[in-house]
Amino acid sequence: MQKLTFTFIVSLILTLGAAGQKISISLFNNLKLSTVLITPTSGSYRLILGDNEVELKVNQILYISRSGDSLMVRDANQNMGTWKRVTVVGQTGEDIIRVKPIVPASPARLYDDNLSFYVDLDRIFAINLIDQEKYVAAVVEAEGGLNREPEFYKVQALIVRTYTFAHLNKHLAEGFNLCDEVHCQSYLGRSEKNSDILDAVLDTKDMVIVDAERNPITAAFHANCGGQTANSEDVWVKPLPYLVSVSDRYCLGSNSSTWERSIPIGEWKKFLSQYGVDTLKIKKNSDLDFQAKTRPKYYAVMGVEIPTTDIRKHFRLRSAWFSVSAGKSEVRLSGRGYGHGVGLCQDGAINMAQKGWTYDQIVQYYYKGVSIVKLTELDMDRIRVDTTLNNMVEPNLPPPGMEFPQRPPDR
C-alpha cells in the first residue's frame, strides 16, 4: 500500500511529544470514496499538484474524483488535470476546510489543518494531517458529549490523548496513524460546539495516564457501570492492575443505570442448550431465575455456568450485569449499567465533576495506581505499549435514549 510521502510525516511517526505535533487520520475510512468535494471555509490554503501550487480561496469549490489509480481535479471553471496526489495545506494555523463525500454520498464535515488525497485499493484515501491537540478536542467532543463540566472534559482529554499515544502506529502499514472509525477513536470533524472542550485539552496539553511502570495505560471507559465497575479479566481475560472493580454510587441517578429486557422463553432455552444445558430437565421455569446483587461473571443455571459477556453479546444487551426472572412465556432481564463496565464510568465521572472532584481525582478513582505525566517526562526508548486489549470496541448497541442518545461504543 502507498505511504504518505510528506517530509513532515516522518517526525510524527517517531514521537507524539513534540510541540505542535501533527498526526495523520484517514477520513470517512469506512467508505469506498470515488468523488469528494472540498471547500475552504476559513483561513488560507494552498493546493499542491505535483510541482505546482495554487491558492484556494475561501468558499472555492474543488472536486476530486478517482480516475484509475490517479485523481482528476476540477473547480467550477476548469479541469485542473490528473495527479497521483492532491495536497491541501493550511497557511495560518487556523485553517478550516469542508469535506463532502459525493460518491458515495455522506454528510459533510469540517476539518482543521491539512488534507492529502491519493488512490489505493480502488478508492480515494482522504488523510487529515492535524495538530494533535485539535484532534484530541474533536474526539472528546464526539465521545464525551456536550454541556459537561470542564473537569470531565479534562478527564476525557487525558483518555483520548493516552489512547492516541499508545496506538500511534495502529495504521502505519497503511500510510497513516489512525482512522476516524470507533475502533480507533470516533472522529467526526473539528471541535466547535463547546469552547470548554478546547480549554480542557489545552489545560492538559501533552499529558497522558501511565501505570506504575510508566507505560501508557489501556484507558478503557464505558457509559454507565450500574454502581460497580468490572475487572478487566472478567471481560477481556487479561488482568491489568489498574483496571479493577470499584464501587461507584455516582452513576446511579443516571437514566442509563438500569434497563429491562424481555426475551421469549423458547429463544432463551435454545441459547442455553448451546452451552450444554439440558433444557428438557427444567421442571419449572423458575429454575431459570438468577439474582445478581453484584456484577456477575457467570449466569449459573442447572449446574452450568455461562459467561454473562457471552449472553450480552448474543442478545445485544446493554450490559453483562442482570438478574433473570422467568415467566410463563418469556424471561425478564433486569439489568444495570450500559457498556462493558471496565475502567472509567462516564456517567459517574460526569457527576463527580459536578460535585467538585478534580480531573486527577476522577482518573485515580477509576484507574488504580496510575499517574498523570507529561510526554516529555517519559523515556520513549523503553516505553512498552500493551496491545493485547486492542479489540475492546463493542458492536453497536441499542441507543440508551436519554442522556447520550447517540453514544459511541465503549472503548
Predicted segments, located by residue:
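N-terminal secretory signal peptides that target proteins for export/translocation
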Residues: 1-2
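Conserved, single-site charged/polar hotspot
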Residues: 5-12, 17-411
